[in-house]
Amino acid sequence: MIQLKHKLVVVLSIPCVVCCPTWAQQPKDSVRVHDLKVVEVVAFHGSCGITDVVPGSVLNRENIANMGITDIADALHRMPGVNLRDYGGAGGMKTIGVRGFGAQHTGVSYDGFMLSDTQSGSVDVSRYALDNIESLTLSIGGENDVFLSAREVSSAALFRMTTLTERPADHRVHLQTQLKFGSFGYVSPFVYYVQSVSNRVTLSANGEYIYAENDYPFTLRNGIYKTHGRRNNSRMNSGHGELNAYVSTGKYGEIDGKVYYYDNSRLLPGIAKYYSDINGESLHDRNGFAQFGWRQHAANGLWSWKAKGKFNWSSSRYRDKYSPNHIMDADYWQREAYGSLAAMFTPTDGLSFAFASDYVFNNLNSSLATDVRPFRHTLLESFSVKYVTPRLVLLGRALYSVYLNGAERGEAAKNGRKLSPSFSLSYRPFSSEQFYIRTSYKNIFRAPTFNENYFFHFGSPRLKPETTDQLNLGVTWQKQFSNRFNLEITADGYLNHIKDKIVAIPYNMFIWTNVNIGRVQSKGVEVSLRGDYQLAEKHNLLFFGGYSYQNVTDREDKSLPDYGKQIAYIPLHSVSGSVKWGNPWVDIVIHGAGYGSRWASNSHYDGTRLAGYFDMGLTCSHRFVMKHGEFSLRGDIKNILNQQYEIVGNYPMPGISYQFVVNYKF
């Protein structure tokens, strides 16, 4: 037992010896290896991706509970390489960047369909409820699955949200009801319904409402002086609902559909500044979409096919009651139509070929007099091949992209087309050890957003796409030391380049415009550790630790003062970790995430340095199993050290707060 304590001290110290956080690396296993021992090991407690050919992370519902995760933003803090932009509070926008790439380079999918915002290019993940999530998956520099739509492989990284997919064996109604309440006026009811109405048809629905005042206190510091304030104009009313249907078309086929609606009316607090806390901004976001999917497999297993279709509509209504003559008020509307066809051919065990063809149409219009009403046609085609043996996995892919731009009232952006290759490999050098070496390369680009192309004065229709190159080399290792102790470790090093980076420069004294001048280099290391130890019957420890080093610098021109400086909002070091004690009475989780210092500007101006911080939390929970259902209670204390910090400059985050969750399902 003494020896065990020493081991645990070493493990739990990993998140504490570095000055900031990272996240667990646990990609989803989509590789079907014939060595049964490999499959068993990878399934252990949600793997760190021992056999995956690309780095990433997977969190399933069990992981989410074991790590004390409270929302999707909290989950992203636990994933290595992620840079989350968070504007604070329950209603603050939250977007994802990965390994120094901006949010525009990170694709986000919801049940296999890509989410999009062609106006800004970034997706706000705070819109989606963690309570409805089955798993969260982050893949960096490629995908492990060969049978994907072309759009799913068109980003530098992909964050996938998969919702609950229960299909009850009986035909009775199954319900889950939940109530969350917490600090700063936070209350959120959630309800989930699922029923197998026949042997082939399953229906489900869920809905969530969130109300929060978000009036948390904060402190402003100016030299030796401190001012205490409280966030105002920060109220949020948000709700969303979904209807889902699943139909089995026989032994080898299935159809699924989803209808989704989201509505969020919120006040915007603006930046925190001295001597004035007056702000009159508000934003009303609405989003609705319908999507449909079909999958079919041949009886002989040689062929598989799938088709997807989606229509998406969204609107944003911005108001500022203090702007002169309401000149800042604006309304925006976006529409998207999407279709995809894909086929996979598996001539023999271990060898697969896949082809996918996607079409996307996007347009945008607004209430502004300067609106040019832009639209875009996108054609994507991908060809993939995957070869698998018990010790070797090879995956190659080529993506051909065509972007055709137009504008009804002005100059259209430049059209573009490009061929983007990628390659990944995983090799197991010793058959007696669960030790793997992996490497991957991906070339990809992103088209300019509508804001970058068309926003009045600021946009430029002559922009070229940003092109990225990603190179990764890593090792993974898993060891079962006894029937009581398991350990998984992954370590990856990477080198990324971005060219033709889109940056804003002053056109004259009053007007800024977007141009392609930037070059950025990103190099770093990610390490994650996960394990469990059986202390005694019904008593176990689950632990996780992660570290990330990200050196992301300007490489455009050595003669310029910004050359070699760390890019804004990216910490050099970050760590995260959690420990859960599972027991028959009350499960306890201690978790934390920390960042080193960052800069709020690429030029590192005086006064733009953001101090590092460590955010620590405590979760206690218990589940009561009853004859006809299950009842659970959970309590969370967030930022238990009451640290004052900012993720985005001048947007203070909440200090210590609490949240209680009551859940009943039957």
How would you name each of these model-derived features?
Residues D35-A65:
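N-terminal periplasmic "start-of-domain" segments of outer-membrane beta-barrel proteins
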Residues A73-M114:
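Extracytoplasmic beta-strand/coil segments of soluble accessory domains associated
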Residues L130-Q176:
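A beta-strand signature from Gram-negative outer-membrane beta-barrel systems
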Residues N214-F218, H228-G241, Y246-W305, F311-E336, ...:
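Flexible loop and strand-edge segments within Gram-negative outer membrane beta-barrel domains
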Residues L302-Y318, I437-S440, E466-K523, S528-D532, ...:
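Membrane-embedded beta-barrel scaffold of Gram-negative outer-membrane proteins
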Residues D349, R391-L394, D492-H497, N516-S601, ...:
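Gram-negative outer-membrane beta-barrel transporters
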Residues V402-R409, A413-G416, Y427-N472, I489, ...:
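Surface-exposed extracellular loop regions of Gram-negative outer-membrane beta-barrel proteins
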Residues F543, G594-S601, R609-A611, T619-F666:
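C-terminal beta-signal and adjacent terminal beta-strands/loops
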